[in-house]
């Protein structure tokens, strides 16, 4: 049985036993907060617990590295939707210690992609710079500052939205603000 099959079996039981009832809320975040964070598995539960957030408090948006690599990427789109459709007035950017995105390199990805059967021609496409798109960052504080700046200076984010950046310690959950 695959992991997805196990999840589907669990889900049937979850619904049948009404496990969802304790999670019922509406689509509007109670704290008018959005959090852009890394998709790292260590933060799956730790992030909300360390921030004191419960289901329904905030919109949580996750990607590799908690970054805004382009003003028109899906994370930025989600933040814009959160502001205009869901009433968000504050945004937290939360990166974390020992982030794998610090060490990402296109060279590594390219090698792995070729091993897994991706044609070399796909990696040479001229419509996207895969080297830039898959390159990580090397300074977490600088990355947080760049992400905060990208949000604050986005032409569709109003000036009355507060945006602040943080680094969470991956093991303890301790937050440090990045100024």
Residue ranges, per PLM feature:
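Short Gly/aromatic-enriched secondary-structure transition segments
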Residues: 48-53
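Gly/Ser/Thr-rich loops at beta-strand to alpha-helix junctions
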Residues: 40-42, 97-101
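Ordered, amphipathic secondary-structure segments that act as subunit-interaction surfaces
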Residues: 84-96
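Structural motif
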Residues: 32-35, 58-59, 89-92, 164-165
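Divalent-metal-activated hydrolytic enzyme cores
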Residues: 1-31, 66-76, 83-86, 101-179
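Short beta-strand segments
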Residues: 36-38, 62, 94-96, 166-169
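A short, structured active-site edge motif that brings together acidic residues
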Residues: 59-67
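N-terminal low-complexity or amphipathic/hydrophobic leaders
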Residues: 28-42
